[in-house]
C-alpha cells in the first residue's frame, strides 16, 4: 500500500501543478490573480464552496467531536451550524460583498469606518486564516503519518511545500480550476467511505448497539455530554458562534468567494444551495465513519483506549478498507486539503497585499510589482502557517483558536451593514479591545499556562462581547458618520446638504452615475482605484446632494442615482450621447462595448484590449450591461458574454454609433 500510495500522490500532485500551469495563461494582472476577474458562475461557485467546506481538517476534527461528545455535537453543533451559516451569510452578504467595491473584509470596513479599523481587521484576518491553513495541513499530516508511518514533521512539510508551489503559480484561477476536480474526488471518496462501512457492518442500529457509550447520538466515549449554553468550548452556543457566524462573517476567503462571482445573485444562491444541501451530504459521512471506527474498535477508541478521533479515519482505512479504495480516499483527503488550504492561503495573501502592502508600504506600486509582491507574501504566509501546525491542543483547539479571532470582525461587519449610528471610534476601540483580550487570553493560557480563560469562557465569546459592548458604548458617546446623524435624510434636503468644490476624480464618479443606477463596485472597478478613494468621492457627492443612495442599509447603500442638482454641475452631453442615455441608459463607451459583443465575445475582448482595459475595467462595464438586461454572462469558469434580445435591439437602434 505504501508504494501505491506514494505513486498515486506523486501523479495527483503532478496533475494539479499541471492544471495550475495551464490556468496561468488566464492571469492578466494582479486583480486577475486575486479575484479571477470576477468571472465565476453559479455552478463553479457551488463547487468552490463545497471544496472549501470539505476541508482536510474535517477528517480529524469531525471524528474527534463524535468520539468526545457524540454524533449530535458533530452533526448539529458543527455540520448543521455551518450549513445554516452559509445560508444566512449568502442572504445577508451575497449582494453586499459583491456590490460595495471592496476586495477584502478589511477594505470593506474602511469604506464604512476608517483606515485604522482596516489595519486592525487586516491583522486579525491574517492571524485567523493562517491558523485555518495550518489546521487543514496538520489534519492531513496526522492521517498520512498514522497510515503510512511517516513522521508528522515530514508529512506536514511536504503538504505545505506542495500547497505553496501550487498556489503561487496562478492565483485564484489555478485554485478554482483544480478545486473543481478536487471536490469531485473528495466528495466521492468520503461519501464512499461512509457507505462502505455501513454496508459492511450494518446500519444505524448496529452503530448504536456497538458504539462505546450508552448513547451514540448524545454522549461521547468518555461519557461527556455537550452543554447547550455554556460559555466554554465546545458547547452548542460556542460551536454556533464559531462555525455559523465567525468563520463566515469575519473571514476574508468567504468574502473573496463572493467577490469572484459575476454578480451578487450568483453569490447569494450558491451559498444557499451549498449550505442547505451540499454540506450535509458531504460532511455527515465523515461523522459516521468516525463513529463506526469507535464501534468497530471499542478497546482502542473507547474510554480506556489509547487512540482518539484524530487517528480514527486513518486507523479505519488501514484496518478495514481495501488498498485500492484506501489510495483513492487518501488522494481525496489530499485533494480537499490542498483545496481549502490554498483558498485560505490566497485569502490571507490578498489581505496583506491589498490592505497592508498596497495601502501602507507601496501605495504607488504598479500591477507588475503588486503581482510579484503577492507571490512573496504568499510564500511568507505559508511559512507562518507551517509553524502554526505545532500549536498546542491539536486540530480541535487550533480550529477554535483561529476562528475565535473573527469575533470582533464579525461584530463590525454586522454593525456596518445594519446600524448607521455605529461610529468609527466605536468600531476601532471595540475591535482593539476584543483583539487585546484575545491576545492576552492566548498568551497567558495556551502559551505560558499561567491563567487559562478557556476554563471559564471561550475566546470567541470573550472577543465577541468585549467588541460589542465597547463598540456600542463608545458609539453612543461619539459622533457618527454623516449618514448616521440625526436629521440626515437619504433624499437630498437643502438643509442637510453642503455644496463643496469637486475634483476631477469626483466629476468622473459623478459622470458614471448620470446614466442610471450604478453600484460602488462598478465605479471602483472601472476607475481602477482602491475603494477608499471611491468612497471618499461618493460621500462628498452625497453630502453635496448630487447623488442619491438607493437605501441606508445593506447592499443598496452602495447603489447610486444622480440627482437633478448633480446633473446640473456636469458638462452637457452631445445630442447623440443624450439620445443614447435616454433610450438605453448607457454611455457611448458602454454602448460601443455592447456593440462589439454583438459581433462576438472575442471581438469584445479585442475592443477592451485596444483601450487598455484591465480585467476589472472590463468587468465593471459587463456588470452594468448585465444589470441593464442587455447581456447574459454564461460559461462555467471563464465568462462568455451573450447579448439578450433587448441588447440586440439597442445595438440595432444606435448602430451608427458603433465603432466595431
List PLM regions with ranges.
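Short, Lys/Arg-rich nucleic-acid/phosphate-binding segment
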Residues: 551-560, 635-641
Amino acid at each position: 500500500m505504501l508504494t501505491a500510495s506514494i505513486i498515486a500522490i506523486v501523479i495527483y500532485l503532478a496533475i494539479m501543478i499541471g492544471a495550475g500551469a495551464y490556468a496561468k495563461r488566464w492571469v492578466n494582472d494582479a486583480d486577475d490573480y486575486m479575484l479571477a476577474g470576477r468571472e465565476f458562475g453559479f455552478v463553479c461557485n457551488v463547487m468552490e464552496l463545497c471544496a472549501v467546506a470539505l476541508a482536510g481538517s474535517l477528517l480529524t476534527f469531525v471524528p474527534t467531536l463524535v468520539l468526545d461528545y457524540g454524533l449530535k455535537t458533530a452533526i448539529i453543533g458543527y455540520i448543521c451550524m455551518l450549513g445554516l451559516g452559509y445560508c444566512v451569510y449568502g442572504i445577508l452578504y451575497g449582494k453586499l460583498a459583491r456590490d460595495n467595491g471592496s476586495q477584502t473584509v478589511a477594505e470593506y470596513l474602511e469604506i464604512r469606518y476608517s483606515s485604522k479599523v482596516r489595519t486592525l481587521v487586516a491583522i486579525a484576518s491574517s492571524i485567523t486564516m493562517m491558523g485555518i491553513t495550518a489546521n487543514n495541513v496538520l489534519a492531513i499530516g496526522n492521517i498520512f503519518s498514522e497510515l503510512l508511518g511517516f513522521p508528522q514533521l515530514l508529512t506536514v512539510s511536504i503538504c505545505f511545500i506542495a500547497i505553496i508551489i501550487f498556489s503561487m503559480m496562478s492565483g485564484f484561477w489555478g485554485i478554482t480550476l483544480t478545486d473543481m476536480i478536487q471536490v469531485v474526488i473528495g466528495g466521492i471518496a468520503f461519501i464512499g467511505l461512509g457507505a462502505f462501512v455501513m454496508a459492511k457492518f450494518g446500519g444505524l442500529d448496529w452503530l448504536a448497539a456497538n458504539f462505546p457509550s450508552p448513547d451514540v447520538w448524545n454522549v461521547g466515549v468518555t461519557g461527556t455530554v455537550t452543554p447547550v449554553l455554556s460559555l466554554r468550548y465546545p458547547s452548542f452556543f460556542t460551536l454556533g458562534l464559531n462555525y455559523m457566524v465567525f468563520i463566515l462573517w469575519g473571514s476574508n476567503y468567504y468574502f473573496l468567494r463572493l467577490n469572484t462571482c459575476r454578480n451578487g445573485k450568483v453569490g447569494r444562491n450558491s451559498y444557499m444551495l451549498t449550505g442547505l444541501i451540499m454540506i450535509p451530504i458531504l460532511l455527515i459521512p465523515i461523522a459516521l465513519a468516525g463513529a463506526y471506527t469507535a464501534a468497530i474498535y471499542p478497546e482502542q477508541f473507547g474510554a480506556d483506549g489509547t487512540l482518539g478521533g484524530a487517528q480514527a479515519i486513518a486507523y479505519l482505512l488501514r484496518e478495514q478498507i481495501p488498498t485500492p479504495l484506501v489510495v483513492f480516499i487518501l488522494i481525496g483527503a489530499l485533494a480537499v486539503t490542498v483545496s481549502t488550504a490554498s483558498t485560505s492561503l490566497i485569502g490571507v495573501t490578498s489581505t496583506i497585499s491589498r490592505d497592508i502592502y498596497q495601502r501602507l508600504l507601496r501605495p504607488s506600486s504598479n500591477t507588475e510589482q503588486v503581482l510579484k509582491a503577492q507571490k512573496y507574501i504568499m510564500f511568507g504566509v505559508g511559512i507562518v502557517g507551517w509553524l502554526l501546525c505545532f500549536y498546542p491542543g491539536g486540530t480541535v483547539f487550533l480550529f477554535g483558536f483561529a476562528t475565535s479571532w473573527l469575533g470582533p470582525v464579525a461584530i463590525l461587519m454586522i454593525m456596518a451593514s445594519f446600524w448607521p449610528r455605529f461610529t468609527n471610534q466605536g468600531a476601532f476601540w471595540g475591535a482593539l479591545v476584543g483583539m487585546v483580550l484575545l491576545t492576552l487570553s492566548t498568551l497567558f493560557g495556551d502559551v505560558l499556562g499561567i491563567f487559562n480563560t478557556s476554563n471559564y469562557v471561550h475566546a470567541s465569546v470573550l472577543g465577541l462581547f468585549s467588541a460589542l459592548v465597547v463598540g456600542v458604548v463608545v458609539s453612543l458617546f461619539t459622533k457618527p458618520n454623516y449618514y448616521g446623524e440625526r436629521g440626515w435624510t437619504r433624499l437630498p434636503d437643502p438643509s442637510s446638504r453642503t455644496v463643496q468644490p469637486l475634483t476631477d476624480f469626483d466629476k468622473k464618479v459623478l459622470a458614471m452615475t448620470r446614466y442610471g443606477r450604478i453600484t460602488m463596485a462598478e465605479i471602483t472597478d472601472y476607475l481602477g482605484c482602491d475603494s477608499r478613494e471611491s468612497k471618499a468621492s461618493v460621500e462628498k457627492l452625497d453630502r453635496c446632494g448630487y447623488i442619491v443612495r438607493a437605501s441606508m442599509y445593506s447592499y443598496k447603500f452602495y447603489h447610486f442615482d444622480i440627482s437633478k442638482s448633480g446633473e446640473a454641475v456636469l458638462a452637457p452631453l452631445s445630442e447623440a450621447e443624450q439620445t443614447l442615455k435616454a433610450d438605453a441608459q448607457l454611455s457611448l463607451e458602454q454602448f460601443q462595448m455592447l456593440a462589439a459583443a454583438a459581433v462576438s465575445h472575442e471581438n469584445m475582448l479585442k475592443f477592451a484590449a485596444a483601450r487598455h482595459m484591465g480585467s476589472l475595467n472590463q468587468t465593471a462595464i459587463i456588470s452594468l450591461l448585465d444589470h441593464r438586461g442587455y447581456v447574459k454572462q454564461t460559461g462555467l469558469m471563464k465568462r462568455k458574454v451573450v447579448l439578450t434580445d433587448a441588447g440586440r435591439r439597442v445595438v440595432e437602434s444606435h448602430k451608427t454609433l458603433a465603432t466595431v
